[in-house]
Amino acid sequence: MKGFSVKPLIWITMLFLGLLPYQAFGLGLTPGNFDTILDTHVETLTVWQLAENNKIYVFDFHGLVTQGKTFNRITHLTEQIQANAGYPRVLTTDEFIKYMDSLRRTQADFAFGHDLLVSELVLFYNLADRDKIDLLPEEIVLRTFLLDQGLIKVWRNFYQSVQSDVVILSIPQEQPHTEGTPPVSKLARQAIFLHELSHGEYYTNPHFAAYCRLFWNQSLNDAQRRAFVNLFKKYNYNTASGELMVNEMQAYLMFTPDPQSFSASKLGVTEGELASMRDMFRRGRPPTRLPLR
């Protein structure tokens, strides 16, 4: 019928059948500074726009599983090595589940936080379309948000970045341990948020990014760089990406205040050497307002 759109009917049907998270409707932006975001308890998915840097959006999830279903497969594409793949591609749902099983991981603990440029999200959705990969409902909700906020658009059946320099971060709320889901303590939430926020700073502050590259290449010695690369191999990062190594180095070294996530023993150095690296980073006066450890 003229003037009638089936799209709302499809969404309502999917919601009724449990195929879409209830957060799919009315997902907008809430302004908030670092402390407000960190200290606010939310029962449903909330998307914050960071007051200190309006190019950073923070997806604040009530549960790790929903966060994982939204971002894990995208992070696998952008940050991890794709074995036996001649070209970048999005894994099917079954392939990704098998991949997580091989790592003894689940949607809940594959990653505890995420950081993505809008341009990387465009890559994910275009590759998924190219290979006719079925998206999870949570991934569809994310795509709809990006379209509704004018961050991406569709042109000739391809997704394009409209604001390619906007950064999407993801963090979980505090939660107790449940069967199949690890706990997230207050300290862990703070560490995850600060860690991911440092990635946002790296992406949106070119002076800070340049400082970090200089620190990696000129301040750290070969053994220290190898220590970070070896650690990141254990975390399944794509260590062939030099830019990723620099970005992760600064985030773990200076902005991960949780010994369960990062410590001298995990890096394979002494406490004194770790303290020395942090001191070198601070003494160089990095151009950032983030709190340095």
Predicted segment positions?
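Classical Sec-dependent N-terminal signal peptides that target proteins to the secretory pathway
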Residues: 7-26
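A metal-dependent hydrolase signature that marks the N-terminal structural subdomain at the beginning
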Residues: 24-170, 286-293
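Short pre-active-site segment immediately N-terminal to the catalytic Zn-binding motif
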Residues: 171-193
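Post-HEXXH active-site segment of zinc metalloproteases
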Residues: 187, 204-231
